Amino acid sequence: MSERIAEVSRDTLETQIRVRINLDGQGKGQFDTGLPFLDHMLDQVARHGVVDLEIVAKGDLHIDAHHTVEDIGITLGQAMARALGDKKGIRRYGHAYVPLDEALSRVVVDFSGRPGLEYHVDYPRARIGDFDVDLFGEFFQGFVNHAAVTLHIDNLRGRNAHHVAETIFKAFGRALRMAAEPDPRMQGTTPSTKGSL
């Protein structure tokens, strides 16, 4: 399997974003988005997905964080799709349950080539510090649309909003890791009876 590394830039009137991902990395992350709590969540994806991930973003945060968060999701999705290439030899499906104290979340992913998001999360409060938790849904929708994956995210329980978010992002990283992992029994084979994804 060739190197699974991609770098993608997105420049609009609202945001300038650069994402670099190495799917076969060591879990190293570098983040500068202007949104410290989002940086913390992205670090969970890198660490628990065991991918090397660099994200630099400048956005119109003087308005709000919506454009920046959504566009980071879009650009990460594009980088993921590019790094995976034709998807031959991968496991395709991944899932993870992750607890953190009282919180528990489940994430299931399919590198199906069909964008679809089922996002079922009720945060116990609207903000974590200065971060609007509604924007996590926008992040995942942007990712799904541009990575062309089916993604199910369910928070099963949790009273602490920080814990809820952290379990989701850790589970997201672990599910991506499982789905993108090379399957030694599927070398050179597309994991679909259609012959393509």
Swiss-Prot record:
It comes from the Bacteria. Signal peptide: none annotated. Pathway: Amino-acid biosynthesis; L-histidine biosynthesis; L-histidine from 5-phospho-alpha-D-ribose 1-diphosphate: step 6/9. It is an enzyme of class 4 (lyase). It catalyses: D-erythro-1-(imidazol-4-yl)glycerol 3-phosphate = 3-(imidazol-4-yl)-2-oxopropyl phosphate + H2O. Keywords: Amino-acid biosynthesis, Cytoplasm, Histidine biosynthesis, Lyase. GO terms for biological process: L-histidine biosynthetic process. It is found in: Cytoplasm. Its EC number is 4.2.1.19. GO terms for molecular function: imidazoleglycerol-phosphate dehydratase activity. GO terms for cellular component: cytoplasm. Its main location: cytoplasm. Belongs to the imidazoleglycerol-phosphate dehydratase family. This is Imidazoleglycerol-phosphate dehydratase. It comes from Thioalkalivibrio sulfidiphilus (strain HL-EbGR7). The gene is hisB.
